[in-house]
Amino acid sequence: MTEEMKFFLFLIERYAQFKGRPTGEVLREWDRKGITQEIYDGYWQYHQEAIQNAYMDIDSLTATGRHAFS
């Protein structure tokens, strides 16, 4: 398993916990909105920052389809 995949799994589990939602539900929402790959590709940004920054960016992607920190 790649470091990117390990981090993605960590991120989605922590994000789901932060939101009080099941992980599968979060993944289905990301898939439905077409942002799963975008979040996965955010590894190089997300793993270097506070996890709360990743949450803010994911919330922005979910709501608007755009990154919070563009």
Locations of regions flagged by a protein language model:
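Long, compositionally biased
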Residues: 43-70
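A generic structural signal for solvent-exposed, polar alpha-helical segments
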Residues: 13, 21, 36, 49-52, ...
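Low-complexity, intrinsically disordered/propeptide-like segments
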Residues: 12-14, 30, 64
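Amphipathic, hydrophobic secondary-structure cores in small proteins
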Residues: 17, 23-46
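N-terminal acidic leader/helix
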Residues: 1-25
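Intrinsically disordered, low-complexity segments enriched in small/polar residues
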Residues: 5, 13, 41-44, 53
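Generic N-terminal helix/loop capping motif
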Residues: 18, 33-36, 61-68
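Generic detector of well-ordered alpha-helical segments enriched in charged/polar residues
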Residues: 9, 24-27, 40, 52-59
